[in-house]
Amino acid sequence: MPKNELRLRPFILCRDFEIISKWITQPREHAMWCAGRTKFPIEREDFVRMLEDIAENCGDTPFVAADINGVPVGFFCYSVNTGSNEGMLKFVMVDPSMRGRGLGRKMLRLAVRYAFEFTGAERVNLCVLSVNTGAKRCYESVGFKEYGRDEGAFRYDNEVWDRCHMTIEKGGI
């Protein structure tokens, strides 16, 4: 596997949590990532509760994108609605020390390919808060397009953020 390649694998709590829990170091960044679904800083029990909740309610599975040594460089959760054939990506994050190298795009391309080829999704959706411009640009670079917006969906301190709904259709990557 070339140096800059990634592989998707299931998130393994005992191996991966300590690594990814260090990626978000600021409260505002944390709010952009999870919209208040977990405490800051990320605590193991709270993170497990969040993963269990989205697994039970939405069928989400957590994944990591790992480098050639098996070390996580990215994380996301994915579910598919088999009735509508729509996949959903959530809680996407990339190791901040690895940003700017195209790994976020590579991880998203792998995630979307997985969704289309292995879960039968016809489209994959995600939401991103409007202030998270870096993430939104990354999603757009993969082929995601904004199709809706919930104005004033989230408040952080004195700020009000919109929630942007984005989608990519099969064949759009």
For each feature predicted by the language model, list its residue ranges.
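Acetyl-CoA-dependent GNAT
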Residues: 2-3, 10-16, 21-99, 108, ...
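Glycine-rich acetyl-CoA-binding "A-motif" of GNAT/NAT acetyltransferases
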Residues: 70-74, 134, 160
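Glycine-rich phosphate-binding loop
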Residues: 102
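Conserved active-site alpha-helix within GNAT-family acetyltransferase domains
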Residues: 105, 130-148
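Conserved GNAT acetyl-CoA-binding A-motif
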Residues: 117-127
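Conserved beta-strand-loop-alpha-helix junction that forms the acyl-donor binding cleft
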Residues: 126-136, 153-157
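Terminal substrate-recognition subdomain of acyl/acetyltransferases
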Residues: 159-173
